[in-house]
Amino acid sequence: MWRPSDSTVYVPPPNPVSKVVATDAYVTRTNIFYHASSSRLLAVGHPYFSIKRANKTVVPKVSGYQYRVFKVVLPDPNKFALPDSSLFDPTTQRLVWACTGLEVGRGQPLGVGVSGHPFLNKYDDVENSGSGGNPGQDNRVNVGMDYKQTQLCMVGCAPPLGEHWGKGKQCTNTPVQAGDCPPLELITSVIQDGDMVDTGFGAMNFADLQTNKSDVPIDICGTTCKYPDYLQMAADPYGDRLFFFLRKEQMFARHFFNRAGEVGEPVPDTLIIKGSGNRTSVGSSIYVNTPSGSLVSSEAQLFNKPYWLQKAQGHNNGICWGNQLFVTVVDTTRSTNMTLCASVTTSSTYTNSDYKEYMRHVEEYDLQFIFQLCSITLSAEVMAYIHTMNPSVLEDWNFGLSPPPNGTLEDTYRYVQSQAITCQKPTPEKEKPDPYKNLSFWEVNLKEKFSSELDQYPLGRKFLLQSGYRGRSSIRTGVKRPAVSKASAAPKRKRAKTKR
């Protein structure tokens, strides 16, 4: 007996599926390039925590293991004074910037920063079998260490994304008791300026997942360490968050400890054979290592050198939508923490209590860019595609969608500010809201830093040498060029006559 197939039949969509195209398909590049550079960018603060007085931060936290997310603001090229007015037609075209060159300059000497905790949860030194902790109520000790070494640079026209493990939600049908291991949840969020990088203890929310505040050093025990979500940014269909990235990481395990406290999930009896006498109790099996970034060398530096963007990893080939660019930098090879000392008295003899010790960390940056001027022809297909991708781009270009026809008659009062009529709806804000107003970035304004004289700047000269473009001609002096002398014609050689 015949019977129909039980497999599911998939019907294709009635309309063709929209395809994401690269920006090179509708963006025309010109031969006009500009150089832009920031001023010397400096940051000074305490490397472990911020100092507060009267609920006000007087000294910020500035650590060599923080993300530096620069929000670079560019001028509007459609309002730019161009050298040639015939480059584009404002009625049918719009101009955009394309980032083609970048150099992140780093000042300050190379150095290794040290972190630690005055009360670190260290029980046994499992690296050396003869060194063990004494059972007691509090076995925490003062331990210092250096962190994992990271160099990172990410460039895009949208903020980068980071991932970390946080505390998840328990199911309602699962009984929960005090001291149970919390469930984990992978959280993706925007990386902001000042967020901590992965130091070797994992990308996680230490404030929620380590309630004893003593399993990791003090600069991360109350915060969250994030790791760039490369998979999520690579899967971005439009490729705005990550044009390209540079990364270098290295770490090795330096010391090995275990944790004090009751083991929540003890070792099964099938895996061990208990001893006799004083070996009947099983020690803590919660092992942990202290990380180390090892040698810091100038031969393995990613910064202070130019990088040229020919082809991005996504569909956005360096176009700076919204006239902004996000540069995310991590450099732990310059994480030296300076120790400052101030005397309390003027005594001639040394006493520890006569001096106060302080710590500071300083950072120095310099950003240089090469931008290429590009044009977009405003056809119906291109405008529809840009509206689907990012409607705010068309709003910045003074384009909008016509509202549908309204069949109802609206009421408009003569006197709006009057107690005789009902309260009117508040008028909407005319200014465009900032989508990143609740996020923290280091804003770098380059609206007045553009220059077409590329040969006057270090990165511009490197670009001219690399690309083969010629700079502007040099200034001519008043010396008259000597006339070309005509060489006298060589005398013709007479042909010797021969007798026949």
From Swiss-Prot:
It comes from the Viruses. GO terms for molecular function: structural molecule activity. Gene3D superfamilies: Major capsid L1 (late) superfamily, Papillomavirus. Keywords: Capsid protein, Disulfide bond, Host nucleus, Host-virus interaction, Late protein, T=7 icosahedral capsid protein, Viral attachment to host cell, Viral penetration into host cytoplasm, Virion, Virus endocytosis by host, Virus entry into host cell. GO terms for biological process: endocytosis involved in viral entry into host cell; virion attachment to host cell. InterPro entries: Capsid_L1_Papillomavir, Capsid_L1_sf_Papillomavir, dsDNA_vir_gr_I_capsid. Residues 491-500 have a biased composition (Basic residues). It is found in: Virion; Host nucleus. It holds the Pfam family Late_protein_L1. Residues 475-500 are annotated as: Disordered. One of its GO terms (cellular component) is T=7 icosahedral viral capsid. Residues 480-490 have a biased composition (Low complexity). Self-assembles into homopentamers. The capsid has an icosahedral symmetry and consists of 72 capsomers, with each capsomer being a pentamer of L1. Interacts with the minor capsid protein L2; this interaction is necessary for viral genome encapsidation. Interacts with protein E2; this interaction enhances E2-dependent replication and transcription activation. Forms an icosahedral capsid with a T=7 symmetry and a 50 nm diameter. The capsid is composed of 72 pentamers linked to each other by disulfide bonds and associated with L2 proteins. Binds to heparan sulfate proteoglycans on cell surface of basal layer keratinocytes to provide initial virion attachment. This binding mediates a conformational change in the virus capsid that facilitates efficient infection. The virion enters the host cell via endocytosis. During virus trafficking, L1 protein dissociates from the viral DNA and the genomic DNA is released to the host nucleus. Belongs to the papillomaviridae L1 protein family. This is Major capsid protein L1. It comes from Human papillomavirus type 6a. The gene is L1.
